[in-house]
Swiss-Prot record:
Keywords: Cytoplasm, Initiation factor, Protein biosynthesis, RNA-binding, rRNA-binding. Belongs to the IF-1 family. It comes from the Bacteria. The keyword RNA-binding applies. It is found in: Cytoplasm. This is Translation initiation factor IF-1. Component of the 30S ribosomal translation pre-initiation complex which assembles on the 30S ribosome in the order IF-2 and IF-3, IF-1 and N-formylmethionyl-tRNA(fMet); mRNA recruitment can occur at any time during PIC assembly. The lineage of its organism: Bacteria, Pseudomonadati, Pseudomonadota, Alphaproteobacteria, Acetobacterales. Pfam families: eIF-1a. One of its GO terms (molecular function) is ribosome binding. One of the essential components for the initiation of protein synthesis. Stabilizes the binding of IF-2 and IF-3 on the 30S subunit to which N-formylmethionyl-tRNA(fMet) subsequently binds. Helps modulate mRNA selection, yielding the 30S pre-initiation complex (PIC). Upon addition of the 50S ribosomal subunit IF-1, IF-2 and IF-3 are released leaving the mature 70S translation initiation complex. GO terms for cellular component: cytosol.
Length: 72
């Protein structure tokens, strides 16, 4: 799947879950399960509850996503 096929949303981290998973409430009021991207893990970027994030999702499964950016 190429980068162009991904769908991007903005949201807020609602809950921290085990195994570096997060429950994210999107701006359109949907709640999804998300994990951090590899570059965020590599650079040790912390994501806490209440943080604004960008989430990348595949059109095939709109209940899971990948956090690609944390806003300051």
């Amino acid at each position: 799947m190429s980068k162009e096929d991904m769908i991007e949303f903005s949201g807020t981290v609602a809950e921290l879950l085990p195994n570096a998973m997060f429950r994210v409430k999107l701006d359109n009021d949907h709640i999804i399960l998300a994990h951090t991207s590899g570059k965020m893990r590599k650079n040790r970027i912390r994501v806490l509850a209440g943080d604004r994030v960008n989430v990348e999702m595949t059109p095939y499964d709109l209940t899971k996503g990948r956090i690609t950016f944390r806003f300051k």
